[in-house]
UniProtKB/Swiss-Prot annotation:
The keyword Cell membrane does not apply. It is an enzyme of class 3 (hydrolase). Keywords: Hydrolase. The keyword Nuclease does not apply. Signal peptide: none annotated. It comes from Drosophila pseudoobscura pseudoobscura. It comes from the Eukaryota. It catalyses: N-terminal L-glutaminyl-[protein] + H2O = N-terminal L-glutamyl-[protein] + NH4(+). The active site is at residues 20, 74, 90. This is Protein N-terminal glutamine amidohydrolase. Its EC number is 3.5.1.122. Transmembrane segments: none annotated.
Length: 205
């Protein structure tokens, strides 16, 4: 496990099961409040695809030895303070909190090569400051047709922006050119945020 003092420990973080998008918003909010100088190096990352069927390993909700689960989408927090240092904070993983980017991606997403195309993962990477401003959810996606909750909501009020009552779908959507941030395939995501020690050494020459 590496050390990163954005968050003292996982127990100090706001967490409600099945509300990963709000859990990550709260992490962004915490950085803005306690470490504002780091906010520009932080991101909210949505994982999904067109069919909203994305397999992830090493998840607390997963089954079997590999702890695999298929989500419609997932969200995690990422801190990228320098070219050779990128850390993932995932409140739903069984991996350490935080985990180095390469280890997290390797164990959580493995490879798309062994998966059917409809299960390939795509990533919407949103700067933390943008996420704090633009994310808005009235939690309608967690209600049944009769109005009851699929999973109990957080005790705090819904996170609503000044311009939109509910825009969660824009963040889950993986169509380039729609929604905030940038959309990457798995290979593009790794290429953009993982720099091996050799690559960093060559860049610094």
């Amino acid at each position: 496990m590496t050390t990163d003092f954005l968050f003292p420990k996982i127990a100090d973080c706001s967490y409600v099961s099945c509300y990963c998008e709000e859990n990550v918003w709260k992490l962004c909010e915490q950085v803005k409040r306690t470490r504002p100088e780091e906010l520009g190096t932080c991101y909210a990352v949505f994982v999904s695809n067109e069919g909203r069927t994305v397999p992830l390993w090493r998840q607390k909700a997963g089954r079997g030895d590999d702890q695999v689960v298929i989500w419609d989408y997932h969200v995690f927090f990422m801190h990228n303070p320098s070219p050779n240092r990128c850390l993932v904070f995932d409140l739903d993983t069984t991996l350490p909190f935080p985990t180095y980017f390469h280890k997290y991606v390797t164990e959580t997403f493995r490879s798309d090569l062994a998966l059917r195309p409809e299960h390939h993962r795509f990533f919407r990477v949103i700067p933390a400051d943008t996420y704090l401003i633009e994310f808005s959810s009235d939690r309608r996606h967690m209600r049944r047709p009769d109005g009851s909750w699929i999973k109990p909501p957080p005790s705090y009020p819904p996170i609503l922006s000044n311009t939109n009552m509910h825009c969660l779908g824009d963040f889950i959507c993986m169509s380039a050119g729609k929604g905030p941030g940038a959309v990457y395939s798995l290979s593009e995501f790794v290429h953009n945020f993982y720099k091996s020690p050799n690559m960093v050494a060559q860049h610094n020459k």
